[in-house]
Amino acid sequence: MDSATVLSIGIAVVVIAVTGFSIYTAFGPPSVELEDPFEDHED
């Protein structure tokens, strides 16, 4: 394969992996540990 193709596929895989991990962290089981700063702030 051409080196540009390999680089493009590599970058695409990294972007998709980061996006998937972000969605998993935001909506999956680890989201229980996330805190809402607006709920913690009392006025």
UniProtKB/Swiss-Prot annotation:
Assigned keywords, A-Z: Membrane, Thylakoid, Transmembrane, Transmembrane helix
GO BP of this protein: photosynthesis
Name of one Pfam family that matches: PsbN
Principal subcellular localization: membrane
Transmembrane segments: 7-27
Subcellular localization, as worded in the UniProt entry: Cellular thylakoid membrane
Top-level lineage group: Bacteria
Purpose of the protein: May play a role in photosystem I and II biogenesis.
Matches recorded under PANTHER family: PROTEIN PSBN
Family in the record: Belongs to the PsbN family.
Family annotation (NCBIfam families): PRK13183.1 (NF009650)
Name of the protein in its database record: Protein PsbN
Gene: psbN
